[in-house]
């Protein structure tokens, strides 16, 4: 026995790998790695992080409690995690050209909740985009806390263009006088006019909050206009197009607002921050500050346009007629299909996406009339325009098979799955 470990069990505790200690969990992780490696990921809110980001999350920082903020902690021994969090904050501020950042929210939903806790009172009126039009649960959807604790008024999209109608947003704001207006969402394929939202907010003396979770990577590189010159406060996730760990962040240029935000995040909503995740955020922000990240985002957008164009040639109806961003909504009604059945058929063929409501959808949320597709993950593993042309045609083949048979075309799905696996083998993950 090693003399440095009087208790023999400790020697194993600090040295034995997961594969030797927990077969069941290790097997689940390996199975998920195989799935990611052999399937094409088109879920718009997912991405593939670098090995460095993954390594940061698997460090000893997971052991450290650090309630409070750098230099003002409730626990001792925080000098090194203070350094890491300070790096994350400074990189976030540089990346988005803003004055203040809070990198502690565990998720985008937590970030949105913290903003409301900081700046609103229960019962206040908020104006956000409806879920079916492309908004998010946290923007006032009835089943969510934001729809229960606040008087949530929802704006949608124009019935003709299927884009935001700013005159309609203004009319709702003038009618309901919201305390907060929320811009952004989870399924908006077109550029958002943040300046117009600020004009409307100022007209009714409302706070403008922008949720840029889906387009943060695009904003960081200048591929989408930044909300920071216009919004009072901006929230985001740190995954999606930003290609970092799963987490949230809050940005602002207003000192009075960041003081309220910091108190709302801790102690208002959260306890100890996840320091290993904050370290990974810092790594991801550092990556996003490099020139390669702009090239990546440019490819994400170009690949999305290519995919949308191919799908249109295959008879698919793309909501708004195309995309300016990383995602698109496919309206399946012209093909007589439901989103849930399309999702299932595509997954059988090795292509992962999600069923999604479309504007003015009459189907239930677990059925839907559409699917949402995104290019961030595929682009991260190296897919370019030629690969996305293939992917678009594979999707077309699978959907056509579903049109001809409600259970799908097993022969087509098997053939596509084989071709998908062959393509993925040329672009392996984490070698």
UniProtKB/Swiss-Prot annotation:
Q: What is its EC number?
A: 2.1.2.1
- For the modification N6-(pyridoxal phosphate)lysine, which residues carry it? 240
Where exactly is the site Plays an important role in substrate specificity? 239
Q: Which residues are noted in the entry as (6S)-5,6,7,8-tetrahydrofolate-binding? A: 131, 135-137
Keywords of this entry: Amino-acid biosynthesis, Cytoplasm, One-carbon metabolism, Pyridoxal phosphate, Transferase
Show the PROSITE patterns listed in the entry.
Answer: SHMT
- Pathway assigned to this chain's UniProt record: One-carbon metabolism; tetrahydrofolate interconversion; Amino-acid biosynthesis; glycine biosynthesis; glycine from L-serine: step 1/1
Catalysed reaction(s) here are: (6R)-5,10-methylene-5,6,7,8-tetrahydrofolate + glycine + H2O = (6S)-5,6,7,8-tetrahydrofolate + L-serine
Q: What does this protein do?
A: Catalyzes the reversible interconversion of serine and glycine with tetrahydrofolate (THF) serving as the one-carbon carrier. This reaction serves as the major source of one-carbon groups required for the biosynthesis of purines, thymidylate, methionine, and other important biomolecules. Also exhibits THF-independent aldolase activity toward beta-hydroxyamino acids, producing glycine and aldehydes, via a retro-aldol mechanism.
Q: What is this protein called?
A: Serine hydroxymethyltransferase 2
